[in-house]
Regions:
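Surface-exposed loop/turn elements that mediate protein-protein interactions on large endomembrane-trafficking
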Residues: 1-9, 35-58, 83-105, 125-141
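Short beta-strand elements that form the blades of beta-propeller/WD-repeat-like
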Residues: 17-35, 71-81, 116-122, 127
Length: 141
C-alpha cells in the first residue's frame, strides 16, 4: 500500500538545490547552517508558485506514495520555523494541493510496516504511526 523512497536532491547553483518527484519539483534555497552541520533551506514549489512557511533540513527528504500512484503522493521533511534551527518537526507535504501537516515532533527514522508508516525517534523513544493521511491536520501554504 505505502511506498517510501529517498528523494533525489540535485545541486543547481551555489545556494540552490532541486528535489524532483513524479508530480513536480521543489527548490531548496540555502539559508543557514547550525553549529552541528546539516544545511537548512527555504522551500519553494515553482509549479504552484508557493513557498512553505517552514525551512527544511537538507537530509531525510522522503517521497511517500500510496499504491505507487502520483495521484496520492506526499513528501516527508525535517523542518523548522524560518530563522531557527531548533524545534525540528517532521512535515508531510502534499505538493499537488499545496498543503502540509506537522507531526509535531522530530522522527529521524521512517519506514513502512504492514500498511502503515512508522516514524520513530530513537533518542526520545517516541513513535508516530500514520495509516490514514486524511486524519492529519492539513494547512494550506
Amino acid at each position: 500500500m505505502f511506498d517510501i523512497e529517498d528523494c533525489k536532491v540535485t545541486f543547481l547553483t551555489e545556494d540552490t538545490y532541486e528535489v524532483s518527484f513524479p508530480a513536480g519539483r521543489m527548490l531548496l534555497k540555502y539559508e543557514t547552517e547550525p553549529p552541528h552541520g546539516d544545511e537548512v533551506c527555504s522551500v519553494y514549489f515553482p509549479e504552484s508558485n508557493n513557498e512553505l512557511p517552514y525551512w527544511c533540513y537538507l537530509r531525510n527528504i522522503k517521497q511517500i506514495s500510496i499504491d505507487k500512484s502520483t495521484e496520492s503522493f506526499f513528501i516527508s521533511i525535517e523542518a523548522v520555523k524560518p530563522h531557527q534551527w531548533s524545534g525540528v518537526v517532521n512535515l508531510i507535504i502534499e505538493p499537488k494541493h499545496s498543503k502540509y501537516a506537522s507531526l509535531d515532533d522530530w522522527y529521524p527514522s521512517v519506514k513502512v510496516e504492514e500498511n502503515k508508516i512508522c516514524f520513530y525517534n530513537s533518542y526520545t523513544k517516541k513513535e508516530y504511526i500514520l495509516d490514514d493521511f486524511q486524519q492529519l491536520n492539513w494547512q494550506s501554504f
